[in-house]
């Protein structure tokens, strides 16, 4: 099944719903970074959340960055998504390992630890919007839910899942986000809470070949659900030699000259796809000349 996101509404527009399958995306991240199963689950949940959150982006060049920083052994998680749901991400410690938690599941909360979540929305304006919340669990889904409630004042329910098999290969990944819009009553809140608690984990449903549409149907069929859109999502890094050149130039002339004198060149490494770019002395001298011309 291809990766995609479904958008829906229910109960006369008072419920906004998103559901996604992201299995291929998470498999690609696992392959690109050589992730341990625990790191795969942690990054996969975060990428799935970001993919669904990208559906709110209207501007073509807009991006959302999720930064999770904790005191656990994974160190941190960074995910970036654009308005086309092209997702890229990495964890600081890709080989993190912990014993299973008391429920027999990967201990994402233990790997993340105590810390914070930043949601940075760059909409092409003068300054990006930055939402900052403390982590409430480190399990990712609960932290996304808390972010929406605290920073955007939108009551939200979030479910995120990554399922691996005995050989530590990703079997399924995906999630859903349900949000209450103005006009939703207490009965609607109770209905959603009961529905969510009554269905299996989202990764289990996807492994059973349930589609995102099927999952939303299970949750909202009694509330006149309407599918309003479907769009692809994928793991894609947009790094390039030109982008790396711009990054090097931000270091300034003195630091670039130091690279030339000490190493006779420089290697730039993309954290999102692990691609490496080599810049020779001649390349760096050319960048220095560009910097000098910009100052004159």
Curated annotation (Swiss-Prot):
Disulfide bonds: 237-239, 270-273
Molecular function via GO: protein folding chaperone; unfolded protein binding
GO annotation terms (biological process): protein refolding
Gene Ontology CC terms, in alphabetical order: cytoplasm
The record's account of how the chain is modified after translation: Under oxidizing conditions two disulfide bonds are formed involving the reactive cysteines. Under reducing conditions zinc is bound to the reactive cysteines and the protein is inactive.
Pfam families referenced in this protein's UniProt entry, alphabetically: HSP33 (PF01430)
Primary localization: cytoplasm
Keyword Ribonucleoprotein attached: no
Matching InterPro entries: Heat_shock_Hsp33, Heat_shock_Hsp33_C, Heat_shock_Hsp33_N
Keyword set includes Oxidoreductase: no
Subcellular location: Cytoplasm
Family: Belongs to the HSP33 family.
Function: Redox regulated molecular chaperone. Protects both thermally unfolding and oxidatively damaged proteins from irreversible aggregation. Plays an important role in the bacterial defense system toward oxidative stress.
Full protein name: 33 kDa chaperonin
């Amino acid at each position: 099944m291809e990766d995609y996101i479904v958008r829906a509404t229910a109960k006369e527009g008072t419920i906004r719903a998103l559901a996604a399958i992201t299995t291929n995306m998470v498999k690609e991240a696992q392959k690109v970074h050589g992730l341990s199963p625990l790191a795969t689950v942690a990054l996969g949940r975060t990428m799935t959340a970001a993919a669904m959150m990208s559906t709110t982006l209207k501007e073509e060049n807009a991006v959302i960055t999720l930064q999770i920083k904790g005191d656990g052994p994974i160190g941190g998680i960074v995910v970036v998504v654009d308005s086309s749901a092209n997702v890229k991400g990495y964890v600081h410690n890709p080989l993190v390992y912990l014993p299973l938690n008391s429920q027999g599941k990967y201990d994402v909360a233990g790997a993340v630890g105590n810390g914070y979540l930043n949601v940075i929305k760059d909409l092409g304006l003068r300054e990006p919007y930055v939402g900052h919340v403390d982590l409430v669990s480190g399990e990712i889904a609960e932290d996304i839910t808390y972010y929406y409630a605290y920073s955007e004042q939108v009551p939200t329910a979030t479910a995120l899942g990554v399922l691996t098999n005995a050989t530590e290969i990703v079997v399924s990944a995906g999630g859903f986000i349900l949000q209450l819009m103005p006009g939703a009553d207490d009965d609607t809140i109770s209905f959603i809470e009961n529905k969510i608690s009554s269905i299996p984990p989202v990764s289990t449903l996807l492994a059973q070949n349930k589609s995102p549409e099927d999952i939303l149907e299970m949750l909202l069929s009694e509330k006149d659900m309407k599918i309003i859109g479907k769009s692809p999502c994928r793991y894609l890094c947009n790094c390039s030699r030109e982008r790396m050149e711009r990054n090097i130039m931000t270091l300034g002339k003195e630091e670039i000259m130091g690279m030339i004198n000490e190493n006779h060149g420089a290697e730039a490494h993309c954290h999102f796809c692990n691609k490496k770019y080599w810049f020779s002395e001649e390349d760096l001298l050319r960048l220095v000349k560009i910097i000098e011309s910009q100052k004159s």
